[in-house]
């Protein structure tokens, strides 16, 4: 799902990072480390003006697509009524236009942290993934083509970036047991 549900009143927010399926447990381990590395950088350094502008421009152009069907228009109209706000597109676009990089960085500092982060991995070899995570096994990235030295150097740091997941907190579930 790439769009939030319409007509569903929210009382709290969730922050999630999703990683696409990868070739192997090593790649999944590396990608998870990369996500945490980048999240830690974002929390420490905030967002740059350039990244902020690019993201805000993307979102301003994306918001109208969220109400592309009559079904979603009705759902978001009900949401606007529930929250007592302007129509969805008008409300969100006006807020995005007024938003500043300082606002975003303040909210990042006040609200994002990785102390109680939770991970879910879906893999064909859960025991291997469990071992990798518990032992903080290195997860070097291997490319099919030559990459710039700067990227390779950063990848070496990321390959050993600590996820710090206590072994006692790592549980492997068989797929047929997940929804019991």
Placement of each model-derived feature along the sequence:
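M16 family metallopeptidases and their MPP-like homologs
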Residues: 1-101, 114-123, 130-137, 180
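Proteolytic maturation boundary segments
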Residues: 91-180
């Amino acid at each position: 799902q790439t769009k939030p549900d319409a007509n569903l009143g929210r009382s709290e927010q969730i922050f999630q990072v999703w990683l696409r399926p990868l070739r192997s447990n090593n790649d999944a381990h590396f990608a998870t480390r990369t996500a945490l590395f980048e999240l830690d950088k974002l929390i420490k350094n905030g967002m740059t003006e350039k990244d902020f502008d690019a993201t805000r421009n993307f979102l301003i152009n994306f918001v109208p697509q969220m109400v592309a069907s009559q079904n979603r228009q009705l759902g978001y109209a009900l949401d606007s009524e529930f929250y007592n706000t302007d129509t969805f597109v008008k409300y969100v676009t006006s807020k995005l236009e007024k938003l500043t990089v300082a606002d975003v960085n303040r909210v990042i500092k006040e609200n994002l942290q990785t102390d109680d982060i939770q991970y879910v991995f879906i893999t064909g070899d859960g025991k291997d993934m469990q071992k990798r995570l518990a032992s903080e096994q290195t997860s070097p990235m291997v490319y099919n083509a030559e990459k710039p030295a700067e990227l390779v150097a950063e990848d070496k740091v990321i390959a050993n970036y600590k996820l710090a997941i206590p072994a006692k907190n790592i549980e492997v579930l068989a797929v047929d047991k997940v929804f019991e």
